[in-house]
């Protein structure tokens, strides 16, 4: 088994790290999504995990990765402010796909946070970033550490936003390998995969939502809006999990 040296790559400056992975990424771009997952499981170190927000198209990556690697830990960072439909979707997919779901939450409850800080999501970019650090980033860091994750799969796609448009298949984030098997998929490919495997979009898709996060920072799509403008009042696209 040929494993890339994670420790050596982590010691490199970011630009050199990207260059070191460039040849591998050129090969991965030519593989299909299933091939990328299989390659990662063969060539990258474990433990392995898949993160999911259980958003609009979440069933794709959950089905894809879990089919190839049954019982892979699926990390959900639960803010306590998800839509009721999201919690129902989580239950449905966890049962249907027999997911090994690992739920992580902030150390402070949602009510305690509001008492201490107020409604952070109403406090501009700085407030949103603090909220995301508490409810998304810290729980994810804890999950990666407790589960001893060395290779992290995620369902990001370049088409989703400008901030994701140049992401490679393979990168390093938070000190671990990060693999994005469906990074180059468009909406049509997503639809075809869901249809082929009898999977559904998130329930709020039919109500006009293109992207779903917390109730207080998610808007329905309206004509003229980009998908990324439906989250965080258009102030930012990422919740912090996929930055850095």
UniProtKB/Swiss-Prot annotation:
Keywords: Cytoplasm, Oxidoreductase. NCBIfam families: cysH, PAPS_reductase, PRK02090.1. It is an enzyme of class 1 (oxidoreductase). The active site is at residue 239. It is found in: Cytoplasm. Belongs to the PAPS reductase family. CysH subfamily. Its main location: cytoplasm. GO terms for biological process: hydrogen sulfide biosynthetic process; sulfate assimilation, phosphoadenylyl sulfate reduction by phosphoadenylyl-sulfate reductase (thioredoxin). Its EC number is 1.8.4.8. One of its GO terms (cellular component) is cytoplasm. Catalyzes the formation of sulfite from phosphoadenosine 5'-phosphosulfate (PAPS) using thioredoxin as an electron donor. The gene is cysH. It comes from Enterobacter sp. (strain 638). This is Phosphoadenosine 5'-phosphosulfate reductase. InterPro entries: PAPS/APS_Rdtase (IPR004511), PAPS_reduct_dom (IPR002500), PAPS_reductase_CysH (IPR011800), Rossmann-like_a/b/a_fold (IPR014729). It catalyses: [thioredoxin]-disulfide + sulfite + adenosine 3',5'-bisphosphate + 2 H(+) = [thioredoxin]-dithiol + 3'-phosphoadenylyl sulfate.
């Amino acid at each position: 088994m040929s494993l890339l040296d994670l420790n050596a790559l982590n010691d490199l400056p970011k630009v050199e790290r990207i260059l070191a992975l460039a040849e591998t990424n050129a090969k991965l771009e030519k593989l299909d999504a299933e091939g990328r997952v299989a390659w990662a499981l063969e060539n990258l170190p474990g433990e392995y995990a898949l993160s999911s927000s259980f958003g609009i198209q979440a069933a794709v990556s959950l089905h894809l990765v879990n089919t190839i690697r049954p019982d892979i830990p699926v990390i959900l960072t639960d803010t306590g402010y998800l839509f009721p439909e999201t919690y129902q979707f989580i239950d449905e997919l966890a049962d249907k796909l027999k997911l090994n779901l690992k739920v992580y939450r902030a150390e402070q409850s949602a009510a305690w946070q509001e008492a201490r800080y107020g409604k952070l999501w109403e406090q501009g970019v700085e407030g949103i970033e603090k909220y995301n650090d508490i409810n998304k980033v810290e729980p994810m860091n804890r999950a990666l550490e407790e589960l001893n994750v060395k290779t992290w799969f995620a369902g990001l796609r370049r088409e989703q936003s400008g901030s994701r448009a140049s992401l490679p298949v393979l990168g390093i984030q938070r000190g671990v390998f990060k693999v994005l098997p469906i990074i180059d998929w468009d909406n049509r490919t997503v639809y075809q995969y869901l249809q082929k495997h009898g999977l559904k979009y998130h329930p709020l898709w039919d109500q006009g939502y293109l992207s779903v996060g917390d109730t207080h920072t998610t808007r329905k799509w309206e004509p003229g809006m980009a998908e990324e403008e439906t989250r965080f009042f258009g102030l930012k696209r990422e919740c912090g999990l996929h930055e850095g």
